UniProtKB/Swiss-Prot annotation:
Major subcellular site: cytoplasm
Compositionally biased spans, kind Basic and acidic residues: 242-292
Keyword flag Oxidoreductase: no
Residue ranges of every copy of the uDENN FLCN/SMCR8-type domain listed in the record: 47-225
GO BP field: autophagy; negative regulation of autophagosome assembly; negative regulation of gene expression; negative regulation of macroautophagy; positive regulation of autophagosome maturation; positive regulation of TOR signaling; regulation of autophagy; regulation of TORC1 signaling
Protein name in UniProt: Guanine nucleotide exchange protein smcr8b
Amino acid sequence: MIGSPDLVAFTKETDFSEITTDSSVLPEDLSVPMYPYTGDATPWSKISSAKLKKDFILISEFSEQVGPQPLLTVPLETKACGTFDLNYFSLRIMSVDYQTSLAGSPGYGSFKLNFVEDSKVVLADSREGVFAYVHHLTLYDLEARGFVRPLCLAYVSSDENKIIQQFQRISTEFNKVSECLKTGNRKNFANELEVKLRDLEYTRVVLQKELNTVSVKCSSEREPILNGVHSFERNADEVKLNEKSSHTDEISPQEKDGCGNSRKVEVKLENENRSHFEHEQYGKQRKDKPDKTSCPMPLANKNDELASVEKLIQDYKSLLKQVTCYPTRKLRDSEYSPYEPDDLPQSFDLDLDSQFAGPMLECSVFTYTNTPSQTLQQINSTSSSRFDKRLKTLEELCDDYFYQQALQQLYSIERTFRGDACYLYTQQLCRNLLRNLKSTNFLFEDPCDLDDDVGLQIGQSTIQQPSFLPAPSFLSGPVSLESYASCVEMVPIKLELGGSSQSQVQHSTLNTPSKDNRPQVADKSPAEVEMKGEIISAPDCQGNVESVSNLMKTSISSGDSIEVLGTERSFRSQGANTLVETAMHRPPPLSSATALEGLKQGRVPTRRTCSEDSIEVLCITESISPDELRASYPCAIDEESPEQETDEKNSSQYQEDNNEKSIYVQGKISADHENACLKKLHPSVTVTPPDCPLTLEETSFQDSCQATESATMLLLDEPSRMVPDDLSDCFSYRSTTASTTSECTFPACLPKDKREGGTRRRRGRVGRAALQFMRQFPFAVHAVFSLLSGRTLVVLGSEEAAVRRLVTALSVYLPHLTKYKDSIQPWTSTPLQLTDLLNWKLIGFDRMCSFNPSSLPHCLDHYSRYLSILDVDQKTLHCPTYSGSLINLLVEPKSHFKRGNTYFTFAQSVQSKLVTKAFLLTFSHGHPSPSRPQGSSGTECFLSELHTDDKKILRYLSELIKLHFMEVTPNVLLFSYTTTSIFKL
């Protein structure tokens, strides 16, 4: 068997050879296989079988009639879902009841509402290949089973990482939407309960009247019946007595005569038959006529129906109390604060008997204000089938104002979380880092990036009223003293003059301070007064000023009410809010002389008195002047009168002509000119209460700019009410002589989501414009140097579109002067003033406004030593030459960038390096360093290796950081004599 040919050794030649290993190759466990790249796939995209075109938001409900069903998608279904099965997915996310509650139903003894907290869950659907963040909530409907309508909000995406990474932010924003929907639903649910209670009260009155009518009718019909029965019984008794007497009289003859017995028996039987026949006839008559002898409806049924109605009234009152006592929860975000529901009536026990005038009773009898007037209806005790009723839609379940706010918030959420998960995560990291760089992040970062939730805000200081909605009642109503509150909520305080022990209480409001000085149009709203062109005379205004001052000295108070009218901190906390609420209905401005007369008032010594249940004012000063209390009144920014502005322009022009002859040393303005500019540019903001204008002097820069931005945003929402002066340069700090034109627009006045660079799309647009500018002008680096060194750049042209396009491109390189305002004027045709150069660093100027359009305008030629001029029509640039190296990468004509977003991000990275160097230059003084030579400062060592032009850039950025750190605005125009060159294509 050993030598058998069937046994063959199965071996290879390589089995016994040595295996060679390459030392340069990675081990197999560390090697990464190559990515199977295809044309449509990318390494960072996850291949998914989802049928979605993009992420969307789905609103679904579990209907008691048809089951789970989709209600709404954001954006529309045709744009987002594609072939995605919404019905199946709604069944998937609503298959579990996350809002289980113990709410009672009409079958139980009493109704009870349990306000359940929202539930949040992340679901994955393997069939559709999608993931969803699902937010469950409960709305209330009077016609629904158990009064509940289960709903859910779902953010549907094919990227699981996006849902997990952004879970916290998505949850926070959906909480806002849910709170908005539930607040509006509680408002509508309370209104429905009011209507139901009115109908029940009306039904109870009708039933009581019907019950009284039926009882009276039945009692009147019962009397003849009883009378007939009694007369019949009397006749029967008489017949019996007669028969008895006849029977006794015939006893003796009967004994005597036995023959007459048979005849007497016959008479007796005949009488019995007659009485029986009469009984039958009477019973037959009662059966033939039942309607005349019985009631229309049994009283027991009426009593039962009335008892059930009264029980329903008590149950619905209990429901209404539960809804109205539920506290409106305030979110921690200051931007989201829904207004409280209107005050509901305290009692529904109204005397309807005196108001009953017929079968139908109007709702005007009731003194409710929450629901519109409608005709009362009688409620039928026999309810119809539940499936015959039509359930309310989502829009009908919520108040219109809150519903539109929720939709606006949902669209904002969809726009914010649109895009790749890596981009969202990087954006979130950058925002967290920028939040810690408050000393430098204002220079080049967009203000939208500095917000925690960009694009997710309903409003800046309060909820912004959509243009397609009417103003709520609390905004459209007249201003009253009760609508203001301070750091102590709803606490009026009594102020008395120092010399008197008692103060006379004036029973008046802010709108009607004095009956004697009240104008004829006092009953009308300020908007109507302004539209009709009626102007209050100066004497009336003077009386109003005195009345307002007296009103502030002696406030409305009672023995048990306390109210804080104003403290030193009240203007900072309430200024922006009162601006938004009252900027749309301010009265026409009065003359400046009258306003100034009202300002020339010294500090009035006052003394506070406290009753047994009063509270001391939270104020540290010894006396309160009317200027300190004006912050409690609604105010709006008003400009100075044209006469005063003209005088200031003339004086400023005279000072400029004289100061042109002065000598400038080392790039600084002389002391006289600086003092004149500072005196001339003293800040002045006009604050307008509802009745007359008053001036509030020495306002801090931050408060004034915030108030300005709020007022201007409100004005931009309604262009029909915009006046040319509302967009003038008086909004910029320390500038009262600048040009006033209706063509001026301010990026700082626009909402945050409308500024340049506020969104990805806008950033891409700005980046593409910058790339086009670099390729169109090879000398673009010199223009960028002018912007980064603090030299004002003017884009001159005859076509507004071309000028605005270049201004948009150059805005990428412009450092912001402060955090609170921008320094860009995209288009103007008014001659420039010296103060404009202090506030604006990038200006678009109209060439056609000059007498000779072919030449340089006179104002630009006059200030040419301070300006760099880019002529769009002639393709020339007049500016100093840049020879440094810090910004060469920023403006490279041969750059290979193709996408605007990519270049915008690259420009921000280069600018961040400049900001880092400027930060070190600003805050590195005095620190010992081993490489620093003896006797040299840190600034000299830091700038020793830089070019002169680069030093100018860093010094300018360092100066801006210093001013921002000290919270001071640039108030001196710094420049230096340098040679300028003309670059031409």
